Amino acid sequence: MSLNFLDFEKPIADLEAKIEGLRLVNQGGEFDISIEEEITKLREKSAEMSKKIFADLGAWQVSQLARHPMRPYTLDYIPRIFSEFDELAGDRAFADDKAIIGGLAMLDEQPIMVIGHQKGRDTKEKIKRNFGMPKPEGYRKALRLMEMAERFNLPIITFIDTPGAYPGVGAEERGQSEAIARNLKVMAGLKVPIICTVIGEGGSGGALAIGVGDRVNMLQYSTYSVISPEGCASILWKSADKAPLAAEAMGVAAGQIKELGLINSIVEEPLGGAHRDHDVAAANLKATIKQQLAQLKSLSVEELLDQRYERLMSFGYC
């Protein structure tokens, strides 16, 4: 799998290219111990360089990682974390929005409802998923599934990964803002545990619409913001070239968001980002979800709702 190295990873990319070149040379002939030793040394050097680079990433670099084309999406996490997933479609009012997926699944022995944004890999899939930007029918589908989960006393797990809610004319005509607002209101009062995780981009109201929970997590190299760095830069400085400055000023990275008390935990990613090893990223996320769900299941409905209310009301207070 091509890792699609980002600009700041160029030194790592150069080393990996050398490793691949030596590997191909050795593959075609007899086993050469000297080449194998050189490959081992280069791999160690690459790992050391990766640790150094990723130990000091800025908010803009994290933003690039959050959008990495090979980063695992909701449909990559579901089979790695859950079993017996049965997708449920449609909002029962207008259409089935492919930018939001959801359905019943098993988390080990626990039945749950899982809901998440879904982007696409290739052009055809990106168009089908509307680049991960849901329309009102997507959020109404999510709401239908969450209310179903409450009826059957199922915990709700959501995965957030969207640049934002779709801003098209049709979406606005069908009540985009109302759909988002209704989700916020209903999620705040659902009588079942809700665990939300930002796995990539957490873009504005489009993220919040499935992001009101008892526990909110972010993957190590995910972002959460009211607007994209490019959008902010275009408004403040009239140029998207100022996006790195905007990213730092907005504080979009997980560490900065946690300092503000807006999330509960940061889920560690493999060295280099979740796209380097989907299985390890999923295993880390599963462990966090299971631990948090065990804590929430020990609470009564009254305690659950009281804690959720206190969490939400604490935002914005010093």
Curated annotation (Swiss-Prot):
Q: Which Gene3D superfamilies does this UniProt record tie to the protein?
A: 2-enoyl-CoA Hydratase, Chain A, domain 1 (3.90.226.10)
The molecule here is called: Acetyl-coenzyme A carboxylase carboxyl transferase subunit alpha
**Can you say where in the cell this protein is located?**
Cytoplasm
Q: Report the pathway entry.
A: Lipid metabolism; malonyl-CoA biosynthesis; malonyl-CoA from acetyl-CoA: step 1/1
**Molecular function in Gene Ontology:** acetyl-CoA carboxylase activity; ATP binding; carboxyl- or carbamoyltransferase activity
Listed under subunit, the entry gives:
Acetyl-CoA carboxylase is a heterohexamer composed of biotin carboxyl carrier protein (AccB), biotin carboxylase (AccC) and two subunits each of ACCase subunit alpha (AccA) and ACCase subunit beta (AccD).
As recorded in Swiss-Prot or TrEMBL, the protein's gene is named: accA
Q: Specify one Pfam family.
A: ACCA
Known catalytic reactions: N(6)-carboxybiotinyl-L-lysyl-[protein] + acetyl-CoA = N(6)-biotinyl-L-lysyl-[protein] + malonyl-CoA
Record-listed E.C. numbers? 2.1.3.15
What is an annotated GO biological process for this record, any one? fatty acid biosynthetic process
Q: Recite the lineage of the species.
A: Bacteria, Pseudomonadati, Pseudomonadota, Gammaproteobacteria, Alteromonadales
**UniProt superkingdom:** Bacteria
Species of provenance: Pseudoalteromonas atlantica (strain T6c / ATCC BAA-1087)
